[in-house]
From Swiss-Prot:
Protein name stated in the entry: Phosphoribosylaminoimidazole-succinocarboxamide synthase
GO biological process, one term: 'de novo' IMP biosynthetic process
Classification via InterPro entries: SAICAR_synt/ADE2_N (IPR028923), SAICAR_synth (IPR001636), SAICAR_synthetase_CS (IPR018236)
EC assignment: 6.3.2.6
Source species: Cenarchaeum symbiosum (strain A)
Family per record: Belongs to the SAICAR synthetase family.
A Pfam family: SAICAR_synt
Reaction(s) the record says it catalyses: 5-amino-1-(5-phospho-D-ribosyl)imidazole-4-carboxylate + L-aspartate + ATP = (2S)-2-[5-amino-1-(5-phospho-beta-D-ribosyl)imidazole-4-carboxamido]succinate + ADP + phosphate + 2 H(+)
Positions in coiled-coil regions: none
This protein's encoding gene: purC
Superkingdom to which the source organism belongs: Archaea
Any one annotated GO CC term: cytoplasm
PROSITE patterns to which the protein is assigned, alphabetical: SAICAR_SYNTHETASE_1 (PS01057), SAICAR_SYNTHETASE_2 (PS01058)
Length: 273
């Protein structure tokens, strides 16, 4: 086993036979800032959620097996340089872009957290700071072909819909999800991992359009950073050419994230962590 790279959340090792090992950690990041604190059992939740979704979803994936509580084995493949985001609700960066006039909506913006008429495919580039990219730009920049873009759009929405049904059955609203794909054996295949770091989960019993929603995902940390003014500070430090300094995450936020990550898995998967 040979160490390859360490990302925001997982460490990746190369195995024999064209396979990789993903080792999920308890590390946490938000707004492209890595924090010193860790979220207990987060890695275990992410690992077991990845296994759950890859086994359940109606699309081939690179998943082979789960080897331990925080490790899965996957087939190695050539990842596509595009992140496939599907939004079912008006929230997050989509709402921010509408407010800034970067994108427009027929009839004007709806109330925050409103359900969109149809799931919206909203991909981004893969870069230090992911940037939205439309079909024309994705093709002209050589990220994917027209045929690949259309396939990714259709399949990403299909995956979102399948996940949404499972989330709804467990009492959650799936607001959006980020997916990644790669080329494996001549076919485009679902890759990376899927869990609370890649989607927004809201408790259905507390869902209320027009307001900030309760989160069972990394949004808990983002909301705290926004409310405490740290998001603004991150932007100012970047504008000044300095790397953002991560604040210490309060213990109460850490405890809430652990509890909600575990609860989300146990409710959706229907089994204890």
């Amino acid at each position: 086993m040979r160490f390859l790279t360490s990302g925001k959340v997982k460490d990746i090792y190369e195995l024999e036979g064209g396979r990789l090992l993903f080792r999920f950690s308890d590390r946490v990041s938000a707004y492209d800032v890595k924090f010193h604190e860790e979220i207990p059992r987060k890695g275990e939740v992410l690992c077991k959620f990845a296994e759950y979704w890859f086994r359940r979803l109606p699309i081939p994936s690179h998943f082979v097996e789960r080897r331990a509580d925080t490790e899965i084995i996957v087939n190695k493949m050539e990842m596509l340089p595009i992140e496939c985001i599907v939004r079912g609700y008006y929230y997050g960066s989509m709402a921010a872009r509408v407010e800034k006039g970067e994108i427009s909506m027929a009839g004007g913006p709806p109330p925050l957290a409103s359900r969109l008429p149809e799931p919206f495919f909203d991909p981004t580039t893969k870069s230090e700071h992911d940037l939205p990219v439309d079909r024309k730009s994705a093709v002209s920049e050589g990220l994917v072909t027209e045929k690949e873009y259309d396939w990714l759009s259709a399949k990403s929405i299909e995956v979102y819909n399948a996940m949404s049904v499972a989330a709804e059955a467990a009492g959650f609203v799936l607001a959006d999800v980020k997916l990644e794909f790669g080329r494996l054996g001549g076919s485009i295949t679902l890759g990376d991992s899927i869990g609370p770091d890649e989607c927004r989960l809201w408790p259905a019993e507390q869902y209320s359009p027009g307001a900030i929603q309760e989160a069972f995902d990394k949004q808990i940390l983002r909301d705290w950073l926004d409310g405490a003014g740290y998001k603004k500070r991150f932007d100012e430090e970047r504008a000044a050419g300095r790397p953002p300094r991560p604040p210490a995450i309060p213990g109460e936020i850490i405890e809430r994230m652990t509890a909600r990550y575990i609860s989300a898995y146990e409710r959706i998967a229907g089994r204890p962590l």
